[in-house]
Every structure is written in structure tokens, then in C-alpha cells.
Regions:
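Long, compositionally biased stretches enriched for glycine and/or charged residues
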Residues: 1-245
Length: 245
């Protein structure tokens, strides 16, 4: 690649912090900003608004970005209509899942060759395994690792997403520096929500599970949070005995 792009944040919630021409070192962020805002306003309108208001380009795309933003679920304003956010087609995805599972079972039983998998995009896993196992030297644009200072203004030890170097000694995070504080605060909220969810499940803590939902960006009132939790715990009671001691 002729362009060095660095993005950082939390899992799937990353922001381009720098973009440079590898040959000349030129900062390409002004060009990215210019070209993106020249696109039709109907293209990724939520990304456009967040880019404008926060100053960095959010990577996920509108239908994923909306999951992390606390102002995208209000039932009165209905921002999903303004930004043309559509739900996933659950029936379609369920069909794809069942088809894929049947196909894999056929391969496992020897009734189908694995040739169809050879060109499947690995999303980086294959390259990482190969370079660790065989002592290679690979630069990967995004991977999740514990924060050991690669993003110094996010909590130490939490899982963050940054570029990484991969070689025979393992996977090593690239230091990207601090995120702008408003963006860091959005990421911190996600990290706290994730930790509360883990702690709630591990401890069987109703209180922490409720706090997880109350802090999450997609439920807008306290009663709904409690109702969702109660319904979930009742529906999956047999799988969550720690909450029923």
C-alpha cells in the first residue's frame, strides 16, 4: 500500500487518527476530509455528521457506528429515520447461517471438498498465525490487544484496537498516542459497559447487569432497561443459573 493509515479505539469502534503518503510523508487527512465531504450527502450521513462534529473519521460505517452512540436510539426524535439506518434482515442472515453450517458439515463429513474455502477472506487471522508460526514480519491495520499504553488516555489493561506488528515473537501493538478527549470518552463508556457485562455474568450480579444496560447507548430510559433485563434472564434462565441462586 502507498498510504499509511492508522486507526485506533475500541473493538469495531475506531477512528482514523492519521493518514500519510508513504513515499513523501505528506499528511493526507486534509485531502480525505475534502474528498469525503464532496460525496453525495446521502452517502453514510451519520458518518458525515460525526466526522464533521468530532474532527476524526469514524471507521465502522453508519449501521455499525450507530450502535455506539448515545443519541441514536431516541423514540421521539427517531434519528434512525433522519440518517436512514436500517435494521439487519434477520431472516436472511439466519438463512445464510444455516446454509454455511450445512456446507461446513458436508466438508467435515468428506462429502464436499474444502476448495471453496481457500479464497475466503481471513480478515487477518491466517496472516497473523502464519507470521507468528514461521517468524515473518507482518503489519496489520487492526487487532485487539490489552492496552499497555498504545492509547494512553484509555484505561490500562482494557482491550483496545490499533495497528499491530506480527512476527515470530508474537503480536505487538503500535503506539498511536492519545485520542481526542471527546472521542476517548465515548470509547471509555464502551469499555465500562463491556466490563460490567463480564462482571455481571461472572458474578451473577443483577445490579451490575442492570448498570450495564443503563450505561449502554441503545436504551433510553430506566424502566425499559429493567424490563429488558428481567425478560432476558427469564427467557435464558436455564443458561444463567448464577442469577437465580
Amino acid at each position: 500500500p502507498l498510504v499509511d493509515i492508522r486507526a485506533a479505539g475500541t473493538n469495531h469502534f475506531t477512528w482514523i487518527v492519521s493518514i500519510h503518503d508513504k513515499r513523501t510523508g505528506e499528511d493526507l487527512y486534509p485531502l480525505l476530509r475534502k474528498r469525503f465531504f464532496e460525496l453525495d450527502e446521502s452517502f453514510e450521513p451519520l458518518t458525515r455528521r460525526v466526522f464533521r462534529d468530532f474532527g476524526l473519521f469514524p471507521v465502522p460505517g453508519d449501521t455499525h457506528l450507530c450502535e455506539y452512540l448515545p443519541w441514536m436510539s431516541g423514540p421521539v426524535a427517531k434519528p434512525w429515520e433522519k440518517f436512514n439506518i436500517r435494521l439487519y434482515d434477520w431472516e436472511l442472515m439466519a438463512g445464510v447461517r444455516d446454509f454455511s453450517l450445512d456446507r461446513l458439515n458436508e466438508m467435515a463429513d468428506g462429502n464436499m471438498t474444502i476448495d471453496g474455502l481457500l479464497e475466503t477472506d481471513s480478515e487477518g487471522a491466517l496472516e497473523m498465525i502464519e507470521n507468528v508460526a514461521y517468524g515473518g514480519n507482518h503489519y496489520h491495520l487492526a487487532a485487539n490487544l490489552p492496552n499497555v499504553g498504545q492509547i494512553p488516555n484509555l484505561p490500562w489493561g482494557t482491550t483496545v484496537e490499533t495497528p499491530v506488528h506480527v512476527n515470530g515473537a508474537g503480536i505487538h501493538p503500535v503506539h498511536v498516542g492519545p485520542l481526542p478527549e471527546p472521542i476517548a470518552e465515548l470509547c471509555r463508556r464502551e469499555l465500562i459497559v463491556a466490563q460490567l457485562g463480564v462482571d455481571a455474568a461472572g458474578e451473577g450480579s443483577y445490579e451490575k447487569a442492570l448498570q450495564c444496560l443503563l450505561l449502554g447507548p441503545v436504551i433510553m430510559d430506566m424502566e425499559t432497561s429493567r424490563s429488558v433485563l428481567d425478560d432476558y434472564l427469564q427467557t435464558y434462565k436455564e443458561h444463567l443459573p448464577q442469577f437465580w441462586k
